[in-house]
């Protein structure tokens, strides 16, 4: 996917108080009455809100070209909220709005535009509160207590649309074909756009647009739409609306990375007790699923999710590869998600105090230089010198680095426990101290053998049990490995108490936890080890690593580990640093169907979809960045299970597919071996 830096919109304001794009020299909405124009062109043009009451599915998907000020979205949101109040028993319960924007507005420009529509204020305020960073790709916003999903794709719509995953095909119920006038923005109004609209459109899906330009009408007709000219808004003579009478036949370009949905969502079991499992439960519940959670321990977050303080910051590089794309978006989503949970009243220690990554040696300095070459927005990451670092952090590390202003720390153990309590209030059934010793496919789903010997049945199973995800016959070929880590808890003192920023070097040091009056310093990283015992040598190594990395920081010498206070956990990691999200692939069937058949020289004209275990899913291998990746990973998995549009491009989703290691070899004609 193209990852050019996203530029914000440059605005001016005309005599009527309407925002004007300096990039396109065109108004964002009608000088006459923007709100009335939106209701007439896009809502009435697509038979909204009347259509809500007869919609046959629980979710309605609307796509839009050109988010702009968000006026179309906010107006539709208002209409949907009124509909839900008037018809709470209607089939339609969820609105999924997908919009594309090449030049997103800044928050203060949004606020100025939104001030013109007081009746939309409650919706506009919530939108601005969650307004994402200017990063390329999809930003998923969960609004209206989960009843509205907004997927904001930042970038060129004609670049993004061909890179959407196959799961987006035939999903869109209505198109808002907006954007600046074709004469002002000809690069957007192309045959490629119209054909992509048809590909994504559901049978009898509709569209409406303010323009009646002949080439637009002809392009939509050639793409398969039935097009009608109707009276335009206000003084405008004509506009276009229409529908797609039937869906188009589509061949997947990458069937080996298919993402099957769950056959049912009435009965889902999750195996695990950490942050990934609990956030997955919440994501599924928000969609109406019935979920049971099985945790082998007597309390949640006893594994890698159980630390007192964990740093939240992204994993970036200058290549804008799948790692960088995923973690940049995941970081922003995680920050919004955790803030939203806190606003809901969940109690967990956290501070959005910023995180600084230090250039403590030549290798780390080169890495930081490479990150800065990626031209990331300063709201995400900014270069800082030693003097700035001292001012930000309260202590002088004696080195330069970079800062993630929206980063910080939180208590994973408290977050997991609070989120689990919320899920239970929402109807989650929890079985603690209940290990699952066997997993067997049945005609109706899956049979789980529990630790006490009894057997229970569930239609769908999600594996989210950390480094134990490869314990099952169905997952034993997956390449995840265990990594032991020990975090030291050190008492604060007058010097360390001045630290107000998370510092990352060849380890990390957090500000003081007000609750415990300790700092966390860590962590050891022992690949292939899964023991949970305290080790004095690792305690010493945690302190020594700080001293070695920051030899000129006298304050580091005040770190006291003599109390031998620490916590041990075991992570599950992969060599490519990305998690496993999706259906569990069937190893034997993958080799049987794909071996010697995926290399371009031997590939048949048609290739079957990837073999997988039906109704068995996985979210795992989150490694040491689980706080960053877990919220978006859970959202992706829940979306896949519900056959919803997914919030990532095709290539990034492929890089998260649990079968990716085997498929990469098979595509190159190499043998697949299991270590």
From Swiss-Prot:
Return the InterPro entries for the record.
FAD-dep_OxRdtase, FAD/NAD-bd_sf, MnmC-like_methylTransf, SAM-dependent_MTases_sf, tRNA_MAMT_biosynth_bifunc_MnmC, tRNA_MNMC2, tRNA_S-uridine_synth_MnmC_C
Please list the GO terms describing molecular function.
Answer: flavin adenine dinucleotide binding; oxidoreductase activity, acting on the CH-NH group of donors; tRNA (5-methylaminomethyl-2-thiouridylate)(34)-methyltransferase activity
- Where in this protein does the record put region tRNA (mnm(5)s(2)U34)-methyltransferase? 1-245
Q: Which HAMAP family match?
A: MnmC (MF_01102)
Q: Which source organism?
A: Pectobacterium atrosepticum (strain SCRI 1043 / ATCC BAA-672) (Erwinia carotovora subsp. atroseptica)
Q: Which cofactor does it need?
A: FAD
Quote the Pfam families the UniProt record gives: DAO, Methyltransf_30
Q: Which protein is depicted? A: tRNA 5-methylaminomethyl-2-thiouridine biosynthesis bifunctional protein MnmC
Question: Does the keyword Glycoprotein belong to this entry?
Answer: no
Biological process annotations from GO:
methylation; tRNA wobble uridine modification
| Membership in a protein family | In the N-terminal section; belongs to the methyltransferase superfamily. tRNA (mnm(5)s(2)U34)-methyltransferase family. In the C-terminal section; belongs to the DAO family.
SUPFAM superfamilies documented for this protein: FAD/NAD(P)-binding domain
Q: Which reaction does it catalyse?
A: 5-aminomethyl-2-thiouridine(34) in tRNA + S-adenosyl-L-methionine = 5-methylaminomethyl-2-thiouridine(34) in tRNA + S-adenosyl-L-homocysteine + H(+)
Q: Tell me its EC number(s), please.
A: 2.1.1.61, 1.5.-.-
What residue spans carry the region label FAD-dependent cmnm(5)s(2)U34 oxidoreductase?
Answer: 271-675
What does the UniProt record say this protein does? Catalyzes the last two steps in the biosynthesis of 5-methylaminomethyl-2-thiouridine (mnm(5)s(2)U) at the wobble position (U34) in tRNA. Catalyzes the FAD-dependent demodification of cmnm(5)s(2)U34 to nm(5)s(2)U34, followed by the transfer of a methyl group from S-adenosyl-L-methionine to nm(5)s(2)U34, to form mnm(5)s(2)U34.
Classification via Gene3D superfamilies: D-Amino Acid Oxidase, subunit A, domain 2, FAD/NAD(P)-binding domain, Vaccinia Virus protein VP39
Annotated keywords: Cytoplasm, FAD, Flavoprotein, Methyltransferase, Multifunctional enzyme, Oxidoreductase, S-adenosyl-L-methionine, Transferase, tRNA processing
Provide one Gene Ontology cellular component: cytoplasm
Subcellular location, record wording:
Cytoplasm
């Amino acid at each position: 996917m193209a990852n050019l830096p996203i530029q914000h919109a440059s605005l001016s304001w005309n005599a009527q108080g309407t925002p004007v794009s300096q990039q396109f020299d065109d108004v964002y909405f009608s000088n006459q009455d923007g709100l009335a124009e939106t209701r007439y062109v896009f809502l009435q043009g697509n038979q909204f809100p009347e259509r809500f009451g007869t919609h046959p599915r629980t979710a309605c998907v609307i796509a839009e070209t050109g988010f702009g000020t968000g006026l179309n979205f906010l107006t539709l949101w208002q209409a949907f909220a009124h509909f839900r109040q008037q018809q709470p028993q209607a089939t339609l319960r969820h609105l999924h709005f997908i919009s594309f924007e090449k030049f997103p507005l800044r928050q203060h420009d949004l606020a100025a535009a939104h001030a013109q529509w007081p009746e939309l204020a409650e919706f506009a305020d919530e939108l601005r509160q969650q307004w994402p960073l200017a990063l390329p790709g999809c930003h998923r916003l969960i609004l209206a207590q989960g009843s509205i999903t907004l997927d904001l794709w930042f970038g060129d719509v004609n670049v993004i649309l061909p890179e959407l995953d196959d799961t987006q095909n035939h999903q869109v119920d209505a198109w808002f074909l907006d954007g600046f006038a074709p004469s002002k923005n000809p690069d957007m109004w192309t045959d490629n756009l119209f054909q992509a609209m048809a590909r994504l459109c559901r049978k009898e899906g509709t569209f409406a647009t303010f323009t009646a330009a002949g080439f637009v009408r002809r392009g939509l007709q050639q793409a398969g739409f039935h097009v009608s000219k109707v009276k335009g808004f206000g003084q405008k003579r004509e506009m276009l609306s229409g529908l797609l009478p039937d869906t188009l036949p589509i061949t997947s370009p990458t069937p080996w990375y298919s993402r099957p949905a769950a056959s049912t969502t009435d009965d889902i079991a999750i195996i695990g007790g950490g942050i990934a499992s609990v956030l997955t439960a919440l994501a599924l519940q928000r969609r109406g699923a019935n979920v049971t959670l099985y945790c082998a321990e007597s309390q949640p977050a006893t594994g890698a999710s159980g630390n007192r303080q964990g740093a939240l910051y992204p994993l970036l590089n200058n290549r804008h590869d799948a790692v960088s794309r995923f973690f940049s978006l995941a970081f922003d989503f995680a920050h919004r998600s955790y803030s939203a949970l806190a606003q809901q009243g969940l109690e967990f220690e956290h501070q959005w105090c910023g995180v600084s990554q230090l250039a403590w040696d030549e290798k780390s300095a080169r890495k930081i230089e490479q990150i800065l070459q990626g031209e990331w927005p300063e709201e995400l990451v900014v270069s800082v010198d030693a003097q700035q670092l001292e001012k930000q952090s309260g202590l002088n590390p004696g080195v330069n680095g970079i800062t993630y202003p929206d980063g910080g720390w939180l208590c994973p153990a408290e977050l997991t426990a609070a989120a689990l309590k919320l899920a239970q209030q929402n109807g989650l059934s929890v079985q603690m101290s209940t290990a699952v010793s066997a997993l067997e496919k049945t005609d109706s789903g899956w049979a789980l053998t529990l630790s006490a010997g009894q057997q229970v049945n569930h239609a769908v199973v999600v594996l989210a049990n950390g480094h134990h995800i490869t314990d099952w016959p169905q997952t034993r070929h997956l390449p995840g490995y265990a990594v032991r880590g020990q975090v030291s808890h050190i008492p604060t003192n007058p010097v360390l108490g001045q630290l107000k920023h998370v510092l990352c070097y060849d380890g990390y040091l957090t500000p003081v936890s007000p609750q415990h009056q300790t700092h966390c310093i860590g962590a050891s990283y022992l690949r292939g080890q899964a023991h949970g015992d305290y080790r004095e040598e690792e305690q010493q190594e945690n302190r020594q690593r700080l001293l070695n990395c920051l030899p000129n920081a006298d304050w580091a010498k005040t770190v006291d580990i003599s109390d031998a206070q620490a916590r041990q956990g075991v992570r599950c990691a992969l060599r490519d640093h990305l998690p496993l999200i999706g259906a569990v692939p069937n190893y034997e069937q993958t080799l049987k169907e794909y071996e010697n058949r995926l290399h371009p020289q031997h590939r048949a004209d048609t290739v079957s979809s990837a073999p997988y275990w039906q109704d068995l899913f996985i979210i795992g291998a989150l490694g040491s960045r689980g706080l960053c990746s877990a919220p978006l990973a859970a959202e992706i998995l829940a979306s896949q299970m519900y056959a919803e549009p997914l919030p990532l491009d095709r290539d990034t989703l492929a890089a998260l597919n649990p079968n990716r290691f085997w498929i990469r070899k098979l595509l190159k004609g190499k043998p697949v071996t299991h270590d």
